[in-house]
Amino acid sequence: MRRVTGTLLAVLALCGAVAAAITMGSAHAGARAKPVKLTVWVGWSARELREFKGVVAEYDAKHPEVQIKVVGSINDTKITNAIRSGNPPDVVSSFTSANVGVYCGTGAWIDLAPFLKKDKIDLSQFPKTSLYYTQYKGKRCALPLLADSYGLYYNKAMFAKAGIKSPPKTFTELTADAKKLTQRSGGKLKVAGYDPFWGEYSGNVADMTNYSPLFAAKYLDSKGKAILASQFAWSKLLRWQKKLVDWYGYDKLVRFQAGFGDEFSGSNAFEVGKLAMMMDGEWRVAFLAAEHPELKYGTAPMPVDDAHPELYGAGSVNGTIIGIPKGGKNPDQAWALVKYLTTDNHALARFSNGIRNVPSTRSSAKSKDLKPDKNFATFLKIFNNPHSTTAPITAAGNANLTLVGRFTVKWQAGKVKNLHNGLKALDKQIDAQNAQAGGGGPP
């Protein structure tokens, strides 16, 4: 999965004009004389797309009644534009689970309840967090297709050279280790022990979702109201982050990051030794194996707030969601494929082995087909930790998080003079956005 930003609500609002003209197919598959051609849109590309196509090819070979075409490098904008035009593919998937509130709330993805009921799908096979980010207000328009959890990657050689014997467990330890591991040359950064910069790769996505479970921080209360200003955890996190940015020097950090390679390439800053530690998703294990198998590294849960040692082992969780778009011409055949991809142990284990994402059902996580890997095992544990959390699902989709990201970028640049007042203003913006979108959502 890849984190992307942007808002879908304005685009999907335009779909209403065609909604009445489109009728959802029944949950009863009909016999067809000729193979039904299914088109599947996914966000994966390159190596990961090849792995997905391999999984689909197995299904295709066993089901002569369908012929499946997989299209990669798809994003949410392309999906919503296709739905709006009335010519969507048969199956769609998205890396942005936070947008499920928009997809379910607007009806852009159809309700899967009739299919789930017909085939007696036991939803308890999916962990609680995955069930949460594939529905909105009880309407389930998606299912999880593998999952992501975030943890700490660290360079073992750099740790040994700095005399650090084990990965940090608290943010105080993380700060101390980051400073020990940092290397400078001629006043410029050569190696950053830990880069806290909001927007630096997926781990430090600016909306802070990957840090919220580490500080027991919540975005919304039980009524769906934003509470960033009233929760001390957010101020504590932001002040920690700004202090470490200032220690490096904001301008120096910006110049240093200008030399980073693309996140999803062999030039990734951690992979080439420019970062000693980094928060990242489990997929990095596969990238490292393919691009830098010689690198000696370790994985661990992310450190946690010193005041909450009980949270150690938890982390941020999200994942790819898959569903059937409104207006799809073959919903029954599309559902059969979605069901296979999301519930078949072999399919999930094979795909997990290929791209090293977390299997999204309890049984597939224990499948004999799943290849063991000690670095990957860290993320399986994080995914199943009861304190792990995901982003809040609201009618506004990812738009709330976009607002948060804009604020944190200003904060780290020193453009927010009063943190509490700034967070209060942010809360008002989020509440207004949710109200306009049709209501808030549970935290």
At which residue positions do the language-model features occur?
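Hinge/lid segment of periplasmic solute-binding proteins
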Residues: 97-149, 190, 212, 369-372
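Paired acidic/hydrophobic, glycine-rich loop segments that form the ligand-binding mouth/hinge
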Residues: 90-94, 276-280, 298
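Short helix-initiation/N-cap motifs at beta->coil->alpha
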Residues: 71-79, 171-176, 254-268
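Conserved N-terminal structural module of periplasmic/extracytoplasmic solute-binding proteins
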Residues: 2-9, 15-102, 106-108, 117-124, ...
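Glycine-centered hinge/linker elements that transmit conformational signals in sensory
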Residues: 178-179, 225-258
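Extracytoplasmic/periplasmic solute-binding protein
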Residues: 141-145, 150, 175-227, 233
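Long, aromatic- and glycine/proline-rich binding clefts that accommodate carbohydrate-like moieties
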Residues: 129, 293, 352-406, 410, ...
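Extracytoplasmic/periplasmic substrate-recognition and gating elements
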Residues: 61, 162, 247, 289-356
